């Protein structure tokens, strides 16, 4: 049994060759790094590295107070990694990566299907050489199907996958979710797939290929709305903040702002109506049960809204919490991240950097009692881990000026 004082991550000793960029793949490899894996992030010197390094402002300052190559977007999914400057078209760099692949447990990439074949870094080639390798490919539409060669960004995946048709006001246009949820969810599915493949390898010695698509992940994330359609044949519609299967479950206006109220069962509805002074509503057959309330949503919600508008946000939250009815505020991001609850849960972490001010990023929400997540490496500057990788592989080159010049960042 592991000693409680052991602070090694659960994935300590795992080596990851990360050929991904933007958000989906980096989300996955950041999670693996948080859990203790060593992640070597490969970045192309000809393009200045990961595209998201240039997705700013804002940028973290360097030691002189100027913008560094760490955009906030890049920092959101790249802590805990070591950046390696390597051009896949360069034979020497490619040989370096082949040596790394030979020692890696996991390779993850998000090139277009077939894009790595010309470099001999595709899954068929590497898995044939290294049968225990777990190789994860992320693309917009997957390795098969009529759309396999189309590019895929988060916004496109939200559109193709149907989630935008559900998001927004009933009389408004389709809207994307406020953050890159297709990318993030795809990265989480990739993490799950990799851990499952590693478990299989532990049992059999066999690696395998994981084929994951942004659009597939987005469609899987339709959850109840997708199954509502599959069961009823009726396409779901945009309903703002309302719930397709529960009423009342929405954002409501108080006298001084907005609150969220989520009445999940009939007993909660009785207590809710007692608070708003409408004890008559649960006695009305149209509203007595959730299925009835769902049918008569349009008749119920205006009455609820009128009653709630007489109260302040604080009174609604205090009154419903006392009655054990789910209720909460609609926080801004500053309010959410600087709340007492967020501080108690380490929702943000500060990471020290050499010769530059520390950066503050979002923390990992996992709270593991024996193998806590690690927040010990800040997001890397471009190429800062190149020599460390060469040392680890036993082939660091000293005083090769031409090679050093070749890997300077291109702006």
Residue map of PLM features:
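N-terminal helix-loop segment corresponding to the beta1-alpha1 unit
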Residues: 1-193, 197-203, 377, 381, ...
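Glycine-rich beta-alpha junction loops
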Residues: 46, 141-142, 214-219, 256-258, ...
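Conserved Rossmann-fold dehydrogenase catalytic segment
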Residues: 143, 171-179, 202-218, 237-244, ...
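A glycine-rich dinucleotide-binding beta-alpha-beta segment and adjacent secondary-structure elements
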Residues: 322-376
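Short Gly/Pro-enriched turn/cap motifs at secondary-structure boundaries
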Residues: 65-66, 74, 239-244, 249-250, ...
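Oxidoreductase and adenylate-handling cofactor-binding alpha/beta cores
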Residues: 187-208, 220-233, 273-280
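Short, surface-exposed loop/helix-turn segments at secondary-structure junctions
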Residues: 53-61, 229-237, 339-353
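Aromatic-enriched alpha-helical interface/lid elements that frame and gate functional surfaces
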Residues: 247-323, 327, 399, 410
